[in-house]
Amino acid sequence: VTFDRVQKLGVKLAGVVVDKYFGMPALKLDGQMLACMASHKSAEPNTLVVRIDFLERDLRVMNEPDIYYLKPHYLNYACVLTRLSLIDDAALRDLLESGWRFLKKKKRSI
């Protein structure tokens, strides 16, 4: 499983572009990171970081800990760590859509 799969699903969302974030492949929306491959040493290999709100993150980690997880470095950020090798396309699409809605809502509230 590679970022190519993430990219194919992500660019279907309005306004999403492919870019880099801390040197890693990323999807951005309005200049903000939506999803990127994890670069921090605490993350497992082949981990995708996706921006979502804290409540949804906590629910995902609690309900599907094999797919979604956290490390101390990421606790204060509105994001979830995702094991790309274990997530199917439907769940990945849903996650990216949630992140897209989160960033759109965040932008409207500014």
Label every model-predicted segment.
Residues 1-110:
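Charge-dense, helix-prone N-terminal extensions
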